[in-house]
Amino acid sequence: YGYTRDFPVEQYWRDNRLNMIHEGTHGIQGLDLLGRKVLMDDGKTLDLLAQRIGQTVQQARGYAELQAESAAVAQGLQTLLDATRAAWSTRQPDEALANATPYLQAFGHVVVAWLWLDVARVAVAAAAGQEDAFLRGKLQAARYFFDFELPKIAAWLAVVAARNPTCREMQDAWFE
């Protein structure tokens, strides 16, 4: 067989060629997101996403247990929107898109935080003061994301907002 692992999941991953194609397109997807998708219809699609996230934040603010998480999503969204505007403030695509990959990573984290906030809101409402292990697990998983993953967006969006030139200025000749 040529594959000596005890568990087949690694072989399934390796044999599915599409996974490797997706891994190789991370940068392209970031360029597409920051360079095309958030600009579509004069930013209306991004505005719609922001409105929907804002609605969930408002609903979650109705629960005392979710105040910190609601504030974190609201702040994350605002940081993302500010970085988007800052990236395009000079209207120079080479400056705006130089850090498209960290933008993609941060954008994804904000969306996942939004989804976790909604899961947490539903869990708190369903528990209604009762102790339920399944719902407690949902809340704890959400809190993990808010405590360990969402804070990463600050660093990613800082280079986007500053239009940091480090990657853009790299030259192939420096590796010859």
Where are each of the predicted segments found?
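Alpha-helix capping/hinge segments and adjacent helical runs
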Residues: Y1-L48, Y144-C167, Q171
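C-terminal amphipathic alpha-helical interaction region
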Residues: K37-M40, R52-E176
